Amino acid sequence: MELRLKERLGRKFDEEIRFFKGWMDGPKQVGAICPTSSITARRMASVINPKSGLPVLELGPGTGIITKAILQRGVAPKDLVSVEYSTGFYQHLVRSFPGVNFINGDAFDLDRTLGAFKDATFDSVISAIPLLSFPMDQRTALIEDLLDRIPAGRPVLQITYGPVSPVIARPDRYKIKHYDFVMRNIPPAQLWTYTRA
């Protein structure tokens, strides 16, 4: 029992060191000061319909905490397409989650980045991209692009650490809903969903 606890604590420490190194290498690419909590990750994955028969798109998986929650939700590794900008995080993810379709690329250029998956329809999108680090026109263009890749009524879920939606309202184009506020995260996390109007 004590050995398992030491192993878990060791893995958690390794994960936090990896996250910190990623943050040091590219602070604009990493939007938080700590990895997402497992509680927040499970809440994010809760919007997925694992019985839809459609793959799931994940953006900004970082160290893989959200990836793990998506897989635990019942999504098969082959049905998860995950885009990570950081090469260091990408290499770690490929080693840690065999069978998941990881792509090292830019979420703001999905037609090029997704390659063979560019015409896929996804059940939903789970995003941990640090949107507040980007100009508003890029944020809204990304949300519009993501909504074109999922069925009407299905969500794009975005985590953020600000008090309001990181994307401006466009009621004629999409609906914004505050999904949850998770205190058990450092910093506390706001979850937002976007669906086609």
What are these model-derived regions, one by one?
Residues 181-197:
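Core SAM-dependent methyltransferase catalytic element
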Residues 140-152:
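A short glycine-rich, Lys/Arg-flanked "PGG" loop and its adjoining helix->strand segment in the class I
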Residues 63-75:
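Conserved SAM-binding loop of SAM-dependent methyltransferases across substrates and taxa
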Residues 86:
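Conserved SAM/SAH-binding beta-strand->alpha-helix loop
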Residues 53-62:
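Conserved class I S-adenosyl-L-methionine
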Residues 89-116:
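S-adenosyl-L-methionine
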Residues 12, 16-50:
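Class I SAM-dependent methyltransferase Rossmann-like catalytic core
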